[in-house]
């Protein structure tokens, strides 16, 4: 962390001496986050998001003996004034499933998710809940296709997830089961719980079998309409990384296209805000750090401009700095976070559509088996935690 940031941080603690120690308040049961033009809002005021990803919350909460890790994570997030966590509300097949077969659910895993939602509420953390993975981890679309094959469907591609009627039926049934679940702790149905900020249709969707984008567009149209028919309380986003279609492929890393389209997908009725992910070190490994940083700035700006055109808020839903990056240091991670946070703050301060960011990812202490290079253990990362707190405090002053 550079000296100017330290001085700003000290000044904030002097001016707002109670802000650091004051716990975040739990929110009431009546008020849902909504959008107001290009802004998130809550209780009549603009809401700016500073938060984190923790995909593992339900997985860890499955075992009552390890639920303290979930509690500690929310405690730490609240300490640094974070207000949103993005997590998986799925685990399809495998050794610790939420859904072990189509329509067959693991009550212990569901109770783990109940606990996550209940604890998030206690610490004033809203949740973004993703409903399926594009990737194989925790089952993903591959598992849905395999279930259909086991029932006699002649499928040859994981992308059949987006078109096969049986598979789409499996997905819809899962959406209904999750949204109508009544929390065993709070006694509130998920669809009626304002702790949840938003549902996410699918994490990082890609459809390489149809690069025109038509297949995925039709799927979003169908599933957004279906989900909203069950739950009109909550916001909905797709889970996009931000890739454009063929007509704007020059903005994508290496001009690749992935069968999704940031513009047309987000124009679907029922999609309430836009998202992007940012991994220039993975997507553009041949570039220098300076060139990657320049690309990242351009990536954010073009999506700010297009979200303004779409008249929807933008959330930077994943970004991070990997410890596996050549030459990595904590100071470089802090500097990267500062750059992203600065862009978010400047956009928000000027009335723009960028409503916040979620870094990837928070881990609790003693969770080294979950390390993926991007982990931030807040208790063990004082300088990064201060950068996060500074962002939380200055965004809160805009509300």
From Swiss-Prot:
UniProt tissue specificity: Expressed in flowers and fruit pericarp.
Active-site residues (renumbered): 204, 318
CC terms in the record's Gene Ontology section: extracellular region
Disulphide bridges, residue numbers: 347-354
InterPro entries tied to this protein: Glycoside_hydrolase_SF (IPR017853), MAN-like (IPR045053)
Record field: catalytic activity: Random hydrolysis of (1->4)-beta-D-mannosidic linkages in mannans, galactomannans and glucomannans
Location(s), subcellular: Secreted
Keywords, ordered alphabetically: Disulfide bond, Glycosidase, Hydrolase, Secreted, Signal
GO molecular function: mannan endo-1,4-beta-mannosidase activity
EC number: 3.2.1.78
Top enzyme category: hydrolase
pH dependency: Optimum pH is 5.0 for both endo-beta-mannanase and mannan transglycosylase activities.
Effect caused by changing residue 394 to A: Activity slightly reduced
Residues given in the record as substrate binding sites: 88, 203, 279, 360
Signal peptide (residue range): 1-26
Family listed: Belongs to the glycosyl hydrolase 5 (cellulase A) family.
Protein purpose: Possesses endo-beta-mannanase and mannan transglycosylase activities. May be involved in cell wall degradation during fruit ripening.
Protein name, as recorded: Mannan endo-1,4-beta-mannosidase 4
Phylogenetic placement of the source organism: Eukaryota, Viridiplantae, Streptophyta, Embryophyta, Tracheophyta
């Amino acid at each position: 962390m550079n000296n100017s940031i330290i001085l700003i941080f000290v000044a904030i603690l002097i001016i707002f001496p109670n802000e650091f120690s004051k716990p975040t308040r739990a929110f009431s049961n009546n008020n849902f986050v909504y959008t107001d033009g290009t802004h998130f809002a809550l209780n009549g005021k603009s809401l700016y998001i500073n938060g984190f990803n923790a995909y593992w919350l339900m997985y860890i909460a499955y075992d009552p003996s390890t639920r303290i890790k979930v509690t500690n994570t929310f405690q730490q997030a609240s300490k640094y004034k974070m207000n949103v966590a993005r997590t998986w509300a799925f685990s399809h097949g495998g050794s610790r499933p939420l859904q072990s077969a189509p329509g067959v659910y693991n009550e212990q895993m569901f109770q783990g998710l109940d606990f996550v939602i209940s604890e998030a509420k206690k610490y004033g953390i809203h949740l973004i809940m993703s409903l399926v993975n594009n990737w194989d981890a925790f089952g993903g679309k591959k598992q849905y296709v395999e279930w259909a094959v086991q029932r006699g469907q002649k499928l040859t591609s994981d992308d059949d997830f987006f078109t096969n009627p049986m598979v789409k039926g499996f997905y819809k049934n899962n959406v209904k089961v999750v949204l109508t679940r009544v929390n065993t702790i709070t006694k509130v149905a998920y669809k009626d719980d304002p702790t949840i900020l938003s549902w996410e249709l699918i994490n990082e969707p890609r459809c390489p079998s149809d690069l025109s984008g038509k297949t995925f567009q039709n799927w979003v149209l169908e599933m957004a309409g279906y989900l909203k028919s069950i739950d009109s309380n909550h916001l909905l986003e797709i889970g996009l990384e931000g890739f454009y279609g063929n007509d704007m492929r020059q903005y994508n890393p290496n001009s690749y296209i992935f069968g999704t389209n940031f513009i047309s997908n987000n124009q679907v009725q029922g999609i309430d805000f836009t998202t992007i992910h940012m991994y220039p070190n993975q997507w553009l490994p041949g570039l220098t750090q300076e060139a990657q940083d320049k690309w990242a700035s351009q990536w954010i700006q073009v999506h700010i401009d297009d979200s303004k055109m779409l008249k929807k808020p933008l959330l930077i839903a994943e970004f991070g700095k990997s410890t596996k990056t050549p030459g990595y240091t904590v100071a470089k991670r802090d500097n990267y976070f500062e750059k992203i946070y600065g862009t978010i703050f400047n956009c928000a301060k000027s009335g723009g559509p960028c409503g916040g960011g979620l870094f990837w990812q928070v881990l609790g202490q003693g969770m080294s088996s979950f390390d993926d290079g991007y982990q931030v253990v807040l208790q063990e990362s004082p300088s990064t935690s201060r950068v996060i707190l500074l962002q939380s405090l200055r965004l809160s002053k805009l509300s």
